[in-house]
């Protein structure tokens, strides 16, 4: 059965108003007619509080019925002439728009879909002509009029049209709703009934009403991520709405989900309805295509309702935020297309009735995939078809709404560089309006990503930046700890002619504080004072916080004194910063003084959880664990609920001591105060259990955290692996590692280090080496801790090959030898060197004319030691002693004879020991040992001895064996040079360690003093050198005269025929000459005669 569509226009007269009613088609009875707003597929219903459930059900049922259109308008009879004028003006405007499109060489294409094929016979062009037939076309759009004369004319007519175009609905029509419509054209057929009174205003069966446009300007658009937004501000200053309606006997549900992509961002269209608030009831104003008449006073606001799915009405809406297009499709006809800022649009018919959209934009490519299924309406081929048109839509500044939407999407995704590139591109084309960009959102994104350069580029795009803009830019620099950037902001402020305010200086001070630049911080403060800007409480808080971060408690209290001198009342934040400064420097008593000062204020300030946490940290840094427990009790005293952070600090305070009971009480307090623990707290609790050797409790804590729904990650499992390491249970550690792999959790290097440490402690070095290779397969990089633990295990097993292999791998991975690695290598080298000496291997060479150690183990020890200290590591006395042990000469008769022959002197066999003062190193150590000891003294490893004190004191109680011996020989070497210069030799007092021990004798138990190991070695050294000494209690005394005689041994004179002589008699002329030279220097006689 074929159904034709008929449009009726009827008029009724009242005493004052004419009522015009138009509807099409007449398929349904009048009682079922729905109140539809012109240009919108949603029904206009009363306010939600006036609707009943029955009404809602009726509206849902009515949404699936056949299409019809009802237009009712109440027009004052006195304004009929104005309607005629409006009609004429609309025709002129329409003709002008058509001529504009022709000048732009825009081609009109006719795309008619008939079951998936194009019909060339049905293509017709519409250029202002009125077509016969049943279709009703309603085109609603805003067009831009460029000529100034037309704009002025349209502005004159805007207010008149505003009063004329009023539609009168029934009393149940929706209250407080206004809509923007550009042009209304009703095309009627020959069956249309027209009132005679309106025949003069209708040309060829058409009635046109136009009014002024309106727009809502939103200079700053808030970027949000919520999917349930109920109110959004939109820019509708220019929009195009194309509505085509063709009667059809069928109603087919057609909700097509279009997806398009811009720069890789997937977007989906939304269906929505638009409502605006109004104080007038049952009056809806229609506006025409006049763009120059900007805003109507009767439309105070425009709001968009949240998206809703309306598949029953078979309408398709493109999201205005994405395309700037509202495309409404009535049942029975494919939707007309209207685009914003689009250069080309092609409609391609498919066999299934679908339409493939391909659009090319100015800025980017918007792609509409053709995989979305679209069920087209079956259209009678006899019906005339209207061609789809291409429109270019721009905002008032020539920028497409799609550009702003693209910027907002990029900003939401955190693509700051793409955002700034887009804005700079618009600026080059003179299309950028920074007033419509929300500045705070961009600076906030830069602050999160520490994008200082992008923030400066954004600021340069702002034509007239304010002090608020510079403050936001300074905040970005402060969060990024970029001092140079912060100073650059200050220069920009000065160059712009503005005076920096207190907030800007405070942010700059905070930036210096976060970077640890205390001097720069105070420099800015003095600059601020010299500029006449008064510092406030936040400024002093930033100063004190910077001093606290650097641990400079004196400067922190200095800033506090300035605060007091300026009569600025400190708050809790300032006091907390002072307590933190005291904690960093270990001044616990000073921190408690600050707490007492808080309570002594005129209005006492009670500590909060930050104060308690800072005090507990101060106690922990000073090693006062018991005092930290007392501070924790203040939480109950002051009724502080606290946060997980302060409870974590309390648990960490008892970690080293392994006080499991106190940690459990803290956990209990958290539960009582309903404080939800986080993963960091559970990790600290597991660490305490590990130090307490309670491994089962540690695993129980992990299960407890899971039962509470805490999402556990690498922090918790690393702490649990550390607990296994502390408990020295390598089997549990392996089980835990397998569990970590089973849950597909990627372990960190700290987790693997704890596993390797547990294996090394369990004497499982081969397995530990296997997991070293597995670290690299996991994509992790071994660090210093990894190689240190492995080297310690190899050193305990005396496996030099493994240690040397690890050292080579460490160098390959870019890990420099640290103190532990150096100590392990030097210890292994010393053992092998001593073994070589004991086995009689030749280790001494006389190639240089003096005795020198030449051995591979000594060379290896010296090499690792040099690499360690060259990296900035300060060695310990133990490491220095091990290296010196590799430079000690062996004590055998063969070496002594070789030394005598090298000297080339004759000595009696009874006085062989007197030759040692004449040998470099005194025959005990390689001469390089003295240089190494002097270097260690310069690094602060060993104390220095002053020769100006008489007698000399040398304490050996805290020194290792080799260090004590070389140190004493170094003193002898210095005294020998002083003796050659004519100085007197002082007495030497050596302090050695003494141990008391009880022994049993026939007379009973007695307590005797035993010399320590170092004292015994020094005594043996003096006896080998034949230096007389006297022991009294813990002191060894060497007489200066005896030492002088030892420096001048008696040798056989080469002129006495082998008789022993005195070395002093043969050296008298040389000694007299040296004395004369010294006397001449003292008298100032420097002549060369």
From Swiss-Prot:
<keyword id="KW-0150">Chloroplast</keyword>
<dbReference type="GO" id="GO:0009507">
    <property type="term" value="C:chloroplast"/>
</dbReference>
<feature type="repeat" description="PPR 3">
    <location>
        <begin position="536"/>
        <end position="570"/>
    </location>
</feature>
<comment type="similarity">
    <text>Belongs to the PPR family. P subfamily.</text>
</comment>
<feature type="repeat" description="PPR 8">
    <location>
        <begin position="713"/>
        <end position="747"/>
    </location>
</feature>
<keyword id="KW-0677">Repeat</keyword>
<keyword id="KW-0809">Transit peptide</keyword>
<keyword id="KW-0934">Plastid</keyword>
<feature type="repeat" description="PPR 6">
    <location>
        <begin position="643"/>
        <end position="677"/>
    </location>
</feature>
<feature type="repeat" description="PPR 7">
    <location>
        <begin position="678"/>
        <end position="712"/>
    </location>
</feature>
<dbReference type="Pfam" id="PF17177">
    <property type="entry name" value="PPR_long"/>
</dbReference>
<protein>
    <recommendedName>
        <fullName>Pentatricopeptide repeat-containing protein MRL1, chloroplastic</fullName>
    </recommendedName>
</protein>
<feature type="repeat" description="PPR 9">
    <location>
        <begin position="748"/>
        <end position="782"/>
    </location>
</feature>
<feature type="repeat" description="PPR 4">
    <location>
        <begin position="571"/>
        <end position="605"/>
    </location>
</feature>
<comment type="function">
    <text>Regulator of the large subunit (LS) of RuBisCO. Involved either in the processing or in the stabilization of the processed transcript, probably by acting as a barrier to the 5'&gt;3' degradation.</text>
</comment>
<feature type="repeat" description="PPR 2">
    <location>
        <begin position="501"/>
        <end position="535"/>
    </location>
</feature>
<dbReference type="GO" id="GO:0048255">
    <property type="term" value="P:mRNA stabilization"/>
</dbReference>
<feature type="transit peptide" description="Chloroplast">
    <location>
        <begin position="1"/>
        <end position="72"/>
    </location>
</feature>
<dbReference type="InterPro" id="IPR053303">
    <property type="entry name" value="Chloroplast_PPR"/>
</dbReference>
<feature type="repeat" description="PPR 10">
    <location>
        <begin position="783"/>
        <end position="817"/>
    </location>
</feature>
<dbReference type="InterPro" id="IPR033443">
    <property type="entry name" value="PROP1-like_PPR_dom"/>
</dbReference>
<feature type="repeat" description="PPR 5">
    <location>
        <begin position="608"/>
        <end position="642"/>
    </location>
</feature>
<feature type="repeat" description="PPR 1">
    <location>
        <begin position="466"/>
        <end position="500"/>
    </location>
</feature>
<dbReference type="InterPro" id="IPR002885">
    <property type="entry name" value="Pentatricopeptide_rpt"/>
</dbReference>
<dbReference type="InterPro" id="IPR011990">
    <property type="entry name" value="TPR-like_helical_dom_sf"/>
</dbReference>
């Amino acid at each position: 059965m074929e159904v034709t569509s008929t449009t009726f226009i009827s008029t009724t007269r009242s005493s004052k108003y004419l009522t015009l009613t138009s509807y099409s088609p007449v398929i349904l009875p009048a009682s079922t007619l729905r109140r539809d707003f012109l240009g919108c597929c949603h029904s206009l219903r009363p306010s939600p509080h006036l609707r009943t459930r029955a009404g809602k059900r009726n509206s849902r049922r009515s949404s699936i019925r056949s299409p019809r259109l009802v237009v009712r308008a109440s027009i004052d009879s006195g304004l009929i002439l104005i309607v005629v004028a409006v009609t004429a003006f609309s025709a002129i405007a329409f003709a002008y728009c058509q001529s504009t499109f022709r000048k732009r060489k825009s081609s009109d294409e006719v795309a008619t879909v008939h079951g998936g094929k194009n019909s060339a016979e049905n293509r017709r062009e519409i250029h202002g002509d009125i077509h016969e037939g049943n279709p009703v076309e309603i085109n609603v759009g805003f067009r831009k009029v460029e000529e100034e004369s037309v704009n002025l004319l349209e502005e004159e007519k805007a207010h008149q049209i505003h009063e004329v175009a009023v539609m009168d609905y029934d009393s149940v029509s929706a209250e407080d709703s206004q809509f923007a419509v550009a042009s209304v054209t009703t095309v009627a057929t020959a069956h249309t009934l027209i009132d005679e009174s309106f025949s003069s205003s209708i040309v060829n069966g058409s009635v046109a009403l136009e009014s002024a446009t309106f727009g809502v300007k939103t200079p700053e658009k808030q970027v949000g991520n919520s999917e349930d937004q109920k109110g959004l501000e939109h820019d509708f200053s220019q929009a195009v709405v194309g509505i085509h309606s063709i009667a059809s006997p069928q109603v087919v549900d057609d909700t097509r989900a279009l997806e398009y992509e811009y720069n890789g961002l997937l977007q989906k269209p939304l269906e929505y309805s638009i409502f605006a608030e109004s104080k007038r009831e049952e009056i809806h104003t229609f506006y025409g295509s006049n763009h120059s008449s900007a805003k109507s006073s009767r439309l105070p606001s425009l709001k968009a309702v949240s998206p809703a799915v309306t598949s029953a009405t078979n309408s398709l809406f493109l999201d205005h935020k994405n395309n700037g297009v509202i495309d409404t499709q009535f049942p029975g006809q494919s939707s007309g297309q209207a685009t914003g800022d689009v250069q080309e649009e092609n409609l391609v018919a498919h066999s299934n009735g679908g339409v493939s959209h391909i659009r090319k934009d100015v800025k980017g490519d918007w792609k509409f995939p053709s995989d979305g299924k679209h069920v087209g309406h079956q259209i009678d081929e006899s019906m005339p078809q209207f061609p789809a048109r291409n429109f270019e839509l721009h905002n008032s500044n020539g920028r497409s709404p799609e550009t702003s939407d693209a910027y907002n999407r990029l900003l939401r995704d955190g693509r700051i560089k793409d955002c700034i590139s887009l804005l700079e591109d618009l600026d080059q084309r003179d299309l950028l309006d920074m007033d419509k960009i929300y500045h705070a959102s961009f600076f906030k994104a830069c602050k999160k990503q520490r994008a200082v350069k992008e923030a400066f580029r954004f600021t340069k795009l702002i034509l007239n930046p304010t002090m608020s803009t510079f403050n936001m830019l300074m905040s970005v620099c402060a969060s990024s700890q970029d001092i140079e950037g912060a100073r650059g902001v200050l220069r920009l402020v000065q160059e712009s002619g503005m005076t920096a305010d207190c907030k800007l200086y405070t942010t700059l001070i905070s930036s210096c504080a976060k970077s640890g630049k205390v001097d720069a911080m105070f420099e800015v403060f003095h600059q601020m004072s010299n500029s006449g800007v008064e510092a406030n409480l936040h400024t002093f808080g930033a100063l004190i916080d910077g001093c606290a971060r650097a641990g400079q408690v004196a400067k922190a209290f200095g800033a506090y004194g300035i605060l007091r001198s300026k009569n600025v009342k400190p708050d809790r934040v300032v006091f907390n910063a002072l307590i933190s400064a005291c904690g960093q420097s270990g001044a616990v008593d000073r921190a408690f003084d600050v707490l007492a000062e808080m309570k002594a204020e005129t209005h006492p300030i009670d500590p909060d959880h930050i104060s308690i946490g800072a005090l507990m940290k101060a106690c922990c840094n000073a090693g006062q664990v018991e005092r930290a427990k007392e501070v924790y009790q203040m939480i109950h005293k002051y009724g502080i609920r606290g946060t997980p952070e302060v409870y974590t600090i309390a648990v960490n305070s008892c970690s080293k001591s392994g006080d499991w009971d106190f940690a459990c009480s803290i956990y209990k307090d958290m539960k009582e105060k309903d404080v939800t623990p986080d993963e960091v707290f559970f990790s600290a609790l597991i660490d305490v259990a590990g130090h307490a050797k309670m491994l089962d409790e540690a695993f129980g804590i992990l299960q407890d955290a899971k039962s509470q729904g805490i999402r556990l990650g690498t922090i918790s499992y690393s702490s649990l692996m550390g607990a296994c390491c502390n408990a020295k249970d390598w089997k549990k550690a392996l089980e835990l590692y397998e569990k970590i792999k089973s849950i597909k959790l990627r372990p960190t290097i700290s987790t693997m280090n704890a596993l390797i440490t547990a294996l090394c402690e369990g004497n499982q070095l081969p397995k530990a080496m296997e997991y070293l290779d597995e670290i690299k397969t996991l994509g992790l990089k071994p660090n210093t801790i990894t190689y240190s633990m492995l080297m310690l295990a190899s050193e305990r097993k005396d496996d030099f090959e493994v240690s040397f292999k690890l050292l080579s791998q460490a160098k390959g991975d870019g890990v420099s030898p640290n103190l532990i690695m150096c100590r392990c290598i030097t210890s292994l080298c010393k053992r092998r060197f001593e073994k070589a000496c004991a086995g009689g291997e030749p280790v001494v060479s006389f190639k240089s004319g003096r005795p020198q150690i030449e051995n591979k183990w000594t060379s290896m020890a010296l090499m690792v030691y040099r690499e360690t200290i060259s990296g900035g590591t300060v060695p310990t006395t133990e490491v220095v002693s091990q290296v010196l042990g590799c430079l000690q000469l062996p004590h055998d008769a063969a070496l002594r004879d070789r030394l005598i022959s090298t000297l080339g002197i004759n000595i009696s066999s009874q006085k062989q020991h007197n030759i040692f003062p004449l040998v470099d190193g005194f025959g005990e150590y390689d001469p390089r040992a003295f240089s190494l000891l002097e270097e260690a003294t310069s690094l602060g490893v060993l104390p220095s001895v002053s020769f100006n004190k008489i007698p000399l004191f040398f304490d050996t109680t805290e020194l290792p064996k080799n260090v004590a011996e070389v140190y004493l020989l170094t003193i002898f070497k210095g005294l020998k040079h002083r003796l050659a210069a004519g100085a007197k030799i002082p007495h030497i007092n050596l302090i050695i360690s003494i141990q008391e021990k009880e022994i049993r004798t026939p007379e009973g138990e007695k307590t005797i003093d035993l010399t320590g190991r170092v004292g015994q070695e020094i005594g043996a050294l003096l006896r080998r050198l034949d230096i007389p000494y006297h022991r009294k209690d813990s002191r060894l005394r060497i007489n200066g005269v005896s030492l002088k005689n030892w420096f001048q041994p008696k040798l056989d004179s080469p002129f006495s025929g082998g008789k022993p002589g005195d070395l002093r008699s043969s050296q008298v002329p040389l000694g007299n000459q040296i004395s004369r030279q010294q006397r001449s220097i003292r008298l100032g006689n420097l002549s060369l005669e």
